[in-house]
């Protein structure tokens, strides 16, 4: 069930984390946190660590003593004491640190002036979009390429709904698209690696090459920063 756990960990965990590490090493632009989003990054780290420790106690544990936290990830052999709020106490910035240990992509949306702005995130397996390109865009701006939906008022209603998300009441939705080959990273940055495959589809191979890509999207209000965390799994 998609409602069983807040964030899903499955049998592909280690391989997907290894792939994420390679992508981040080759293209650091897949990670972004604007200066005003530091509190949101710590918010996201807390939400992810707490939920992983609750839902998968055999793999993750979190012990807190005030601002002194101790995180253990048994799947990746990580044992990390740190001070919450002090980035220098972690091997890397907080969103990147926890993002390297959780399956799925994460965007942090700053809410201001009656809109949501994509001002932070860690995205290594997008379906035809780019965090580096969308950085700083408003909700409607980054959805502009979606055909017909804006004219139908879909994004007006979606934005109104998301602006009213309450802390502690996350919402989930499923999104789907068609993709060529079972590839997670179909970003514009890697188009030269996979784009030509679209022109090779024939009536004879369509059944083997075209895949239904289904994404579980979770939208949650972060309590300290009031940002919205948008996860895509």
Spans of features found by a protein language model:
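Extended, well-ordered protein cores
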Residues: 1-233
């Amino acid at each position: 069930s998609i409602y069983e756990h807040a964030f899903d960990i499955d049998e592909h965990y280690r391989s997907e984390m290894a792939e994420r590490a390679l992508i981040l090493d080759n293209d650091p632009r897949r990670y972004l946190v604007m200066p005003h989003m530091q509190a949101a990054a710590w918010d996201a780290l807390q939400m992810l660590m707490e939920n992983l420790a609750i839902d998968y106690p055999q793999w993750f544990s979190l012990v807190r003593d005030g601002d002194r936290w101790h995180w253990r990830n048994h799947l990746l052999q990580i044992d990390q004491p740190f001070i919450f709020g002090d980035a220098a106490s972690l091997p890397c910035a907080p969103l990147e640190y926890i993002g390297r240990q959780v399956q799925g992509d994460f965007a942090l949306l700053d809410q201001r002036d009656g809109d949501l702005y994509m001002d932070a995130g860690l995205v290594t397996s997008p379906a035809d979009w780019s965090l580096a390109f969308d950085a700083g865009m408003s909700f409607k701006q980054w959805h502009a390429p979606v055909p017909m939906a804006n004219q139908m008022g879909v994004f007006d209603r979606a934005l109104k709904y998301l602006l009213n998300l309450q802390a502690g009441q996350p919402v989930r939705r499923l999104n789907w698209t068609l993709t060529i080959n079972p590839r997670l990273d179909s970003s514009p940055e890697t188009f030269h690696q996979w784009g030509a495959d679209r022109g090779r589809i024939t009536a004879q191979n369509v059944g083997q090459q075209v895949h239904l890509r289904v994404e579980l999207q979770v939208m949650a209000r972060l309590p300290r920063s009031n940002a919205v965390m948008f996860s895509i799994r």
